[in-house]
UniProtKB/Swiss-Prot annotation:
This is Small ribosomal subunit protein bS16. Signal peptide: none annotated. The keyword Ribosomal protein applies. InterPro entries: Ribosomal_bS16 (IPR000307), Ribosomal_bS16_dom_sf (IPR023803). HAMAP family: Ribosomal_bS16.
Length: 93
């Protein structure tokens, strides 16, 4: 059972919205998912990526492979989380 971390489209025309899911590699794009890990809203003004990083790390440790797009998004989410963690102590001091 090969698992992939990938995007499934749930938005409508001109309003894209994607779920970040763990799914069987051979299943359809919008087919059944094993678990929902977050959302990606490309047209949002704020942070377009919302991920549960604990669950992402769990599935990566279990052997799930991210698609190329998801690999880049996970890296971006990790960088933004690290930047927020550094900014929080500086703001409170």
């Amino acid at each position: 059972m090969a698992l992939k971390i990938r995007l499934t489209k749930v938005g409508s025309v001109h309003q894209p919205l994607y779920r970040v899911v763990v799914a069987e590699a051979r299943s359809r794009r919008d087919g059944d998912a094993v678990e929902n890990l977050g959302t990606y809203t490309p047209k949002s003004k704020g942070s377009p990526i919302k991920l549960n990083m604990e669950r992402v790390d769990y599935w990566l440790s279990k052997g799930a492979l991210p698609t190329n797009t998801m690999h880049a998004m996970i890296k971006k989410a990790r960088r933004s989380a690290a930047a927020q963690a550094e900014a929080a102590p500086a703001a409170s001091a």
